[in-house]
């Protein structure tokens, strides 16, 4: 019912005291995760192995994927967006952006030698008003970084006084990238946290869909990359990020408050950390040659300015990659209310989550299932640094595991196995300094598990279950009510109400697994012609008829208008609907055509199962990803069930090629009506569109 569960671990909720990154004009998700800061990561990643003198995967390539990449297909397209849609700020020690291009705009000059394909592009930085030096900061001084080199110790940062009223001088910093090709690019800002830093730095991102504004609390997070969103940019230099020294309405600053500015980067890029043998000259070290998002956390942490004491805790990259992640959480949260005794970046992290899959097979091909792990004691203590009881991690791990198993049993397999709820001394659940857990969702080595595991619908359901578990745990911890964000709307359709107006209608989707996931409002996003979707606007005065919701919008002849609808409530917003388009030619033949989008399939690849041979056959049917696929590394080549695992290079049954790793494969974008409409308009026809589900129910109206 959305009520908080009573428990002995309840503590005071301070989430609105010092918000970190706030998107302006966002709905108030007071029953969601607004004001919460969550640290999470997905499994392992490509790393340098000294024993073999090569970059390699930390796990065996099996069933068309590898754990290093497989859990990405939950965390990046589903889990992180769900948490962000609920209002959370999510940080991760692995690169989240599969975009292989990367542009760095900075106040310091960048390296000159080593430019070329696959290497970062230098953008432009400019200032207006009065600025001064703010001390040590970022500089992209090397084409590659090795050993413990820290780019956040190689340059400088800038500062300007906050403008408390219109009579004081305005100051502005602007970062302008030279985008090499149109696409989606994550935007990371950086700055310096000083004693008098403002809690309300005002950033504006100009992108193909318009402008997005953010308020960033610069009292925390200084000296690393701070993600603020992913946006579509056109090729060239039309986009930019702007920081100004105004004080946003509703905020107050001290008399000596300052804003600070350092580098901004666009896109994830390619690996830029070089490794080699200890007795090898550093100039002979090599990078992974792969996109940054495929690499382990160790390398992103170095690129993000993590302290050398974190990076050098272990003497090999394999152990350092997973062993340093808890220390990274401690560094990010150090000095905050959740980790008050440590030095760090002062971000009050509410929880930490490690998303893994397990190894192991069953002789009868039954489900291995889901294991949840927490750690009661760290260095002999059952208390966190802020005095809270570490036993609450058991409640957290239980909530998440329960949501996952219950939802899988109801939606996919009633016999899905619930494994243990372990108290074990795993680094990722022991050292994080905040409530933490490690999830082993399923066995990536077990064919029965992976029949479900390669299905995008399964990954959506599991990710939603993890998000619900986190939400309900934090509700219990802080004693606040919760609501789960709605599911995407269905039965979307458009129809003309005149030559310059269109009726949009849809239905809310009932969530049979969650009573609180009921929409209370809707957001409409619009794209005109070949532009990008805008930020959207909340629809006021929608007409409700039975279970159908509708609204009217205006159009201008000669343009194609594309729409998608998002449902929201006090807990957050849904994923967007499919995209429908309409258009009226300026001088047409007066006839209308209905375009029906009936391509709604998402699926796992084809599989077969016999006593001796089994596996996935992508040549027969590669399946259909949701929007895009990032976990496919190559087709399965070993189908003999009898072959055992020998080592990760010879994993036996299920073994897969790896020649496609790091590539992004097209999936179902649910955005096709405009393509057909463009051709129809060229032929003189007006067009509108509908989802296939409406047509199947003969409900076009």
Model-derived regions: residue spans:
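Aromatic-Pro/Gly-enriched surface loop or interdomain linker
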Residues: 63, 78-86, 94, 579-700
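Active-site-adjacent mobile loop/cap segments within catalytic or ligand-binding domains
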Residues: 148, 163, 249-252, 263-271, ...
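A short beta-strand element within beta-rich, extracytoplasmic domains
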Residues: 160-161, 171-195
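Extracellular carbohydrate recognition and processing domains
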Residues: 208-237
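Short beta-strand-plus-loop segments that form exposed binding edges in beta-rich domains
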Residues: 242-257
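Active-site microenvironments of hydrolase-like enzyme catalytic domains
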Residues: 276-281, 294-392, 422-445
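Pro/Thr/Ser/Gly-rich low-complexity, intrinsically disordered linker/stalk tracts
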Residues: 473-516, 557, 571-591
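Beta-strand-rich modules
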Residues: 552-572
